[in-house]
């Protein structure tokens, strides 16, 4: 049930709708790579080695081709590598080795550093994740600074001035404000949060969406701020895989709680028989009621309810009085007619008037009609 609801919510999500309604874009090739890579990261979070390392390695291999989909997707691949490195567990082991607890027999720093490097080379998954980070950043940089300028008549990357990356780094507070203003940005971010029932941001996998969100919201091109066209397509598998990761983690938590229920009951019974002076009389824990309430929600809320909410939030923009999503056009009588409007007739005449082999300037509405073949 959970899988069916998640699949329905993903298929009806605004990012998929808008991309299907718009003209085909190369970002569509990113979806299978993102889905398979993030899917392996979800599985890695539920396994121990060697199964975990195997899933992390597969996640890195599936993410590597993202660098060839579009110039910014290399940064997304690098972010997947960072999440894979964290999920591999190697960083925790490296930190414990470099900064051990106080002990009489702590080796010198350089031997500890060599041990960390040796562990990195031998740890399956950690090396692949690190190399994926380097791979993604390398190809994004090379694409924007070498490959694309070669094919440009002015030998430059035409979109370089759309995002002031160095300005954002010099003034991060202003960049943070620009992420949410003007209102079109806040509305797009709100819709992105809502389509994943808000809970998807709890997963570490949600960080994979940050590069795409950053370049869109920091861009000077106002069309990037909106939830239309194909711009949100690559975010949809990230949102729903992150939501799946949250649900899987909740399921695993419930399983662990059920497995230890007998031990907890025995401990509670033992505490009940203690004398009053033996019981813990420390100061009251003001946060305990909130923790208990959160624990009760996690343990008792049906898992299928979360993807159901995601599906409801996904369908809601289609069914409003003033729908904003393409599927709402199915109820428009104009959608079912074959009669062309005067604008469409004029566009067809303009296309027919262009000689074969001629070069013309056009907008996006008829560009595909002018492509040979």
Residues covered by each model-derived region:
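Aromatic- and kink-enriched transmembrane "portal" helix at the membrane-lumen/periplasm boundary
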Residues: 3-31, 40, 63-64, 68, ...
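Transmembrane-embedded, aromatic-rich helix segments that form part
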Residues: 57-66, 71-87, 132, 208
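Perimembrane helix-loop-helix junctions
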Residues: 76-134
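Signature aromatic-anchored transmembrane alpha helix within multi-pass, membrane-resident enzymes
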Residues: 133-137, 251-270, 275-324
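Short periplasmic/luminal acceptor-recognition loop of GT-C membrane glycosyltransferases, typified by
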Residues: 344, 350-373
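Membrane-lumen/periplasm interface segments of specific transmembrane helices
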Residues: 90, 121-200, 205-211, 310-320
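Hydrophobic/aromatic-rich transmembrane helices and adjacent perimembrane loops
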Residues: 75, 207-256
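Specific aromatic-rich, kink-prone transmembrane helix
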Residues: 9, 28-47, 55-63, 238
């Amino acid at each position: 049930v959970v899988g069916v609801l998640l699949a329905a919510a993903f298929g009806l999500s605004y990012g998929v709708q808008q991309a299907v309604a718009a003209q085909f874009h190369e970002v569509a090739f990113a979806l299978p790579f993102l889905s398979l890579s993030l899917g392996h990261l979800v599985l890695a979070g539920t396994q121990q080695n060697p199964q975990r390392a195997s899933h992390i390695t597969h996640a890195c291999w599936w993410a590597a081709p993202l660098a060839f989909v579009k110039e910014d997707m290399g940064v997304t691949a690098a972010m997947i590598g960072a999440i894979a490195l964290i999920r591999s567990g190697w960083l925790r082991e490296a930190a414990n080795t470099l900064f051990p607890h106080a002990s009489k027999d702590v080796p010198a720093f350089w031997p500890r550093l060599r041990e960390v490097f040796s562990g990195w080379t031998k740890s399956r998954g950690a090396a692949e994740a690190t190399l994926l980070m380097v791979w993604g950043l390398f190809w994004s940089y090379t694409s924007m600074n070498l490959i694309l300028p070669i094919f440009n008549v002015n030998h430059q990357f035409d979109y370089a001035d759309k995002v002031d990356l160095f300005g954002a780094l010099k003034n991060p507070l202003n960049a943070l404000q620009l992420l949410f203003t003007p209102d079109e940005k806040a509305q797009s971010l709100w819709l992105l949060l809502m389509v994943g029932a808000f809970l998807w941001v709890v997963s570490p996998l949600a960080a994979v969406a940050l590069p795409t969100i950053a370049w869109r919201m920091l861009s000077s091109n106002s069309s990037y701020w909106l939830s239309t066209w194909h711009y949100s397509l690559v975010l949809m598998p990230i949102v729903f895989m992150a939501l799946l990761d949250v649900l899987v983690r909740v399921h695993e938590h419930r399983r662990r709680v059920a497995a230890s229920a007998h031990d907890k009951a025995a401990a509670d019974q033992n505490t009940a028989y203690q004398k009053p002076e033996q019981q813990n009389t420390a100061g009251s824990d003001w946060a305990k009621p909130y923790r208990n309430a959160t624990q009760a929600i996690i343990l008792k809320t049906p898992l299928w309810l979360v993807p159901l909410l995601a599906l409801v939030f996904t369908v809601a923009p289609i069914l409003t009085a003033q729908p904003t999503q393409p599927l709402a056009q199915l109820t428009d009588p104009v959608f079912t007619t074959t009669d062309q409007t005067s604008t469409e007739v004029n566009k067809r005449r303009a296309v027919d008037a262009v000689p074969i082999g001629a070069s013309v300037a056009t907008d996006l509405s008829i560009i595909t009609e002018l492509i040979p073949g």
